[in-house]
Amino acid sequence: MLELSVSRLGFGLVAASPWLLLLVVGASWLLARVLAWTYTFYNNCRLLQCFPQPPKQNWFFAHLYLVPPTEQGLRKSTQLAANYSHGYLIWFGPITPMIVFCHPDMLRSIANASAAVAPKNMDFYKFLKPWLGDGLLLSAGDKWSRHRHLLTPTFHFNILKPYMKIFTKSTDIMHTKWERLITQGHTRLDMFEHLSLLTLDSLQKCVFSFDSNCQELSSCRKPSKYITAILELSELVAKRNRQIFLHADFLYFLTLDGWRFLRACRLVHDFTDAVIQERCRTLPENVDDFLKAKAKTKTLDFIDVLLLTKDEDGKRLSDEDIRAEADTFMFEGHDTTASGLSWILYNLAKHPEYQERCRQEVQELLRDRESKEIEWDNLAQLPFLTMCIKESLRLHPPVTIISRCCTQDIVLPNGWVIPKGVICIIDIFGTHHNQSVWPDPEVYDPFRFDQENIKGRSPLAFIPFSAGPRNCIGQTFAMTEMKVVLALTLLRFRFLPDKEEPRRKRELILRAEGGLWLQVEPLSASPQ
């Protein structure tokens, strides 16, 4: 047997077996890793001393429960933005620091950093991975750059223009349902419920050219399995995010919720795969000519555009990539837009003078026109309605925070240093409610977005669609849908606040506990 003298280690002349040697090497490696981690942690703590931090709950939990995802937590975010107007340090337990930015001057360095320097923090987004795959939301590096480049033309106004008719049709369906409910005596409606189905309805038509009738079916029986699965996945991800001990995959997928999540993922993927395979099966050999000819006679849906897309080398997206992007678009497009629209109607219900002015602007635009449809060129002719939308997105941003992880040290304008590996939170809600950026931030005032008032304001003061190279690629799509739905809805209905004030709730998007309820009246029955 091989024998080694380990006397130099201080053990005297001892016969060492290979197992002992392996143990020594392993212990040395582990010690080196611990020392390296300790040095990095100490160095990070030294660099982070310049950042102010609120008082800790205790040494172990630190700031873990400082900002709960409730109305109280959102008020705490506003208070923290007031106390630490440029940003602050919090500890997620005893050893994990996070820097929260709530001021345009400070978040600029993170928001404008390249995707390689400040990629998304996957600890924050990993729960979506089995559902969305490597779509734009979750991909990184060269794959993200390639997909972003390929998909940007997908949201060109020439592609979006035909979707206006889809938005109009889906809105008309919702209005017909509302009129029926109101005649039955149901004048108190949950905006989130109805607008979520509207956005899912329009998205399925825009993405797949598929009419699920989900809005009509909802009043008498459950929507399609696909729609149910989308809603279930959103709910399960938000629920898991609150359950810290189920963040580990090996634990979560042993639970009933984990099984439900995987089942819903399979259902969503099967639906998307079936659409892609059917579309590919029916495509002729000359795909480009076929799709271009189709575009002249029919609206190209998102799947068509993805099939048509190719890079400089002529390479197309794989079926797996197309599925990931379609699923990502469905996820990002329905909940966020529904949240935005719900809070806009809430704010207009609270401020009837602004609601009436928006209505008059739309009525004036469509005066003496046979068709009461909003056309693409009309969107720029609704300045006050646009101001009201933006102010609502400031006060109630659908996405309240985004998370980044620095791959290198980043020096801020004031000389502070964000150490490599530290998680950074861009607090959209905190920035929008920061009194050093927005005077009287809790007041709903659309005139903040008047052209004169915008001058001199940092573009990073208003970031409902994020900012920088990883901003929301579909923001024009979302704003277009919100303008069309809001304009047509104000032509037919008047909104009044409910007796109970909603309590805001931070999940994947900004919701209201128990729904966002408003009193809805047909315009013809309302006082003039």
From Swiss-Prot:
Compartment(s) where it occurs, according to its Swiss-Prot or TrEMBL record: Endoplasmic reticulum membrane; Microsome membrane
Q: Name one GO cellular component term.
A: endoplasmic reticulum membrane
The UniProt keywords, alphabetically, are: Endoplasmic reticulum, Heme, Iron, Membrane, Metal-binding, Microsome, Monooxygenase, Oxidoreductase, Signal, Transmembrane, Transmembrane helix
Q: Where do the annotations place heme binding?
A: 332, 472
* Chief site of localization: endoplasmic reticulum
**Cofactor dependency:** heme
Q: Which InterPro entries match?
A: Cyt_P450 (IPR001128), Cyt_P450_CS (IPR017972), Cyt_P450_E_grp-I (IPR002401), Cyt_P450_sf (IPR036396), Cytochrome_P450_Monoox (IPR050196)
Q: Which reaction does it catalyse?
A: prostaglandin E2 + reduced [NADPH--hemoprotein reductase] + O2 = 20-hydroxy prostaglandin E2 + oxidized [NADPH--hemoprotein reductase] + H2O + H(+)
Signal peptide (UniProt feature, chain positions): 1-36
Topology with respect to the bilayer: Single-pass type I membrane protein
Residues in coiled coil? none
* Enzyme class per UniProt: oxidoreductase
Q: Which residues cross the membrane?
A: 87-107
tRNA processing is among the record's keywords: no
**Gene3D superfamilies the UniProt entry points to:** Cytochrome P450
In alphabetical order, the GO MF annotations are: heme binding; iron ion binding; monooxygenase activity; oxidoreductase activity, acting on paired donors, with incorporation or reduction of molecular oxygen
Q: Which SUPFAM superfamilies match?
A: Cytochrome P450
EC numbers: 1.14.14.-
Q: Record keywords: Metal-binding included?
A: yes
- What family does this chain come from, according to its entry? Belongs to the cytochrome P450 family.
**What is this protein for, i.e. what is its function?**
A cytochrome P450 monooxygenase that catalyzes the omega-hydroxylation of prostaglandin E2. Mechanistically, uses molecular oxygen inserting one oxygen atom into a substrate, and reducing the second into a water molecule, with two electrons provided by NADPH via cytochrome P450 reductase (CPR; NADPH-ferrihemoprotein reductase).
The name this protein goes by in its record: Prostaglandin E2 omega-hydroxylase CYP4F21
The species this protein belongs to is: Ovis aries
